[in-house]
């Protein structure tokens, strides 16, 4: 095993990377409230894992969506547990994200030189809220349907571009299959991809600049 390790070490300098990760200075003022961002990340990873598992059974059609969710909850092995964990983790992710934003704001973590870290964090907060809006509709029950109808109807109040925006969100003039397809694509592909991209921007900046000092 040592020869295998030495082979990788010679090419990748694994030990230097490990030393950099484990020897990062942590300021003495850091407490449990500075862990809220990490908890949010953990919830996101749980969301990815449980959401991926449910894609094997979920059918994004207006005729089968609700029945497929019922199948997950009542017949699929551990489906009830996977979906329940997905829902609980979603609520926890939103809560931790809100608390994290408040903590950063109240401790001045948005100030120079961490402005870009703050901006990417705000974008991640918006993406997190978007996950909630799009995921809420996927069971396509009465609550999900009317929630989508209300949310997608909000832009209609905007002059000139309101109606085109509504049609863009819904895929047609009314809520239907095109709307569900759009929300499913956003929830399972577009939003996770954007979230991963902004996380890859957010975390290296935190790593580079370190944790902000006490007020």
Swiss-Prot record:
Cofactor(s) listed in the protein's UniProt record: heme b; heme c
Binding residues for heme c: 35
Pfam families, sorted: Cytochrome_B
Recorded GO MF terms: electron transporter, transferring electrons within cytochrome b6/f complex of photosystem II activity; metal ion binding; oxidoreductase activity
Subcellular localization(s) per the UniProt record: Plastid, Chloroplast thylakoid membrane
Protein known as: Cytochrome b6
Organism: Helianthus annuus
This protein's record includes keyword Transcription regulation: no
Co-factor binding comment: Binds 2 heme b groups non-covalently with two histidine residues as axial ligands.
Keyword Nucleotidyltransferase: no
TM stretches of this protein: 32-52, 90-110, 116-136, 186-206
One GO CC term, this protein: chloroplast thylakoid membrane
Subunit structure as annotated in this protein's UniProt entry: The 4 large subunits of the cytochrome b6-f complex are cytochrome b6, subunit IV (17 kDa polypeptide, PetD), cytochrome f and the Rieske protein, while the 4 small subunits are PetG, PetL, PetM and PetN. The complex functions as a dimer.
Residues at which heme b 1 binds: 100, 202
